[in-house]
Amino acid sequence: METEAEVIPIWQNKPHGSTRSVVRRIGSTLPLKPCPRACFQELPGLPSMRSLDGPLVPTLADIAWIADDEEETYARVRSDTRPLRHEWRPTPLLVMHRNSSVPNFRREGRRVEGLRKPGVTALNRTTALQDELSRLRAQIAKIVAADSDSNPITPDLLSPDDTSMGFSMAPFETAAYQPPPTASFVISDVTEEDEEEEEEEDREEEEEDVSELVPDPMPPVSMTASATFDLDRPTMDFREPEEDTVSLSKSTSFADVMDMLKDMNRLKMSKDRYNRGCTSLREEDSASLISEALRKKFVLKDDDISMRK
């Protein structure tokens, strides 16, 4: 008896049952066997680094435990035991290095926090430098005020014009009318100050006579060194001829700091103008005293260079 296999076309298959999918029909005919499970075998000679009390399979509880491990760069589970830090050496089978692309947020947070906090040493050093600077400024102001009271030598610092600030250089103009160049002196070392003071007393009478005959020239406007100061401008009625004259030396040592400090001690407003209240310069204001002395020095230097030209 012949049996003929019934062929059922695919388009006539039912949407359910054993003929629903071609994959099911192939799987029912092919002898498929499951793959064998992987088995791990402990190597002889390795130290026992796992405790029998805890679970051997890592779980989600190990994640927080690994995150708390700050001193090691590799991950390990809770069951790892380390007798001594200097004796324990991880084997290649257990070491899992940290991926370099994954950032370590714990270390980054500490580094950023350290950068945000200012250094206590740097703050203390800055405060000490500021205190030292204030003390030096006060000492220089006291020296300038003391020397200026004993030796008032200054040119006319105020201009009659209210719109421009300049300086009157009458001593340089009067030097042309004097036969010998005795109307000026040269700023030199401190050892020659006594001789210069004696010569200045002899010249005061001659300078007063000549300065009254010659009018003051127009004051220059340019300055090579700028300083912050506050001066009251007197009118023409209160202008009086200066009694002292100043002439800078022709040497090239004006840029030297020592020469600048020596000249600062010898420059000051005249006593008449200071008594009349024509200036708001105060002795206790060290910055104003220093800026005033530097202003006089550099203006006199510029005028001396222009006269030589």
UniProtKB/Swiss-Prot annotation:
Main location: mitochondrion
InterPro entries cross-referenced by the UniProt entry: Mtfr1
A single GO BP: aerobic respiration
Any one Gene Ontology cellular component term annotated for this protein: mitochondrion
Record's subcellular location: Mitochondrion outer membrane
Composition bias type Acidic residues, residue spans: 190-211
Chain positions found as Phosphoserine: S253
Membrane-related topology note: Peripheral membrane protein
Tagged with keyword RNA-binding: no
Region Disordered, residue ranges: 189-221
Role according to the record: Mitochondrial protein required for adaptation of miochondrial dynamics to metabolic changes. Regulates mitochondrial morphology at steady state and mediates AMPK-dependent stress-induced mitochondrial fragmentation via the control of OPA1 levels.
Family, similarity comment: Belongs to the MTFR1 family.
Protein name as annotated: Mitochondrial fission regulator 1-like
Gene source species: Danio rerio (Zebrafish)
Gene that produces this protein: mtfr1l
